[in-house]
Amino acid sequence: MTAILVTGYRSFELGIFSEKDKRVAIIKKAIKRDLIAYLEEGVDWFIFTGNLGFEQWALEVANDLKKTYPLKTATIFAFETHGSTWNDRNQQQLQQFRATDFVKYSYPSYESPKQLKSYHHFLIHNTDGAYLFYDSEHETRLSYLVAAMKEQPCYPLSFLSFERLNDIADE
């Protein structure tokens, strides 16, 4: 079994506030190419943390690919309360994560920063690599997870870059 953690920018961090934004189609096109490459290398699980934006789009692509490839998806939330304050539209999108093949949460609710560090450790040590849409020049709180990943000597990281998205848009 090979499991890849999929994470990246949230939609608001990219300035995307509608699924009709033309950038979403470009991002999904890149995701599809990359997920197919992973599947052809033998990956059979894609693991998500339940964030809207890149993860949501990757989950949608993975669900479409299930028609052709034998893959599984999982969501491991940091907290059981993840998304509890989101609006109705976002709650509906959150349901996609709750409908994956495997769903768990690490903690009932947030109590201290140590929980997030432990959660990151768990994700890294229970996956075989990560697929990220993240650029260190455009930092978000995802930087903590990326830094923890980079500390692992044999933890492969694959990044989707803004440059690559521009190339796909130009096709």
Swiss-Prot record:
It holds the Pfam family YpsA. Gene3D superfamilies: 3.40.50.450. Transmembrane segments: none annotated. Coiled coil: none annotated. InterPro entries: YspA. Belongs to the UPF0398 family. HAMAP family: UPF0398. This is UPF0398 protein SZO_03970. It comes from Streptococcus equi subsp. zooepidemicus (strain H70).
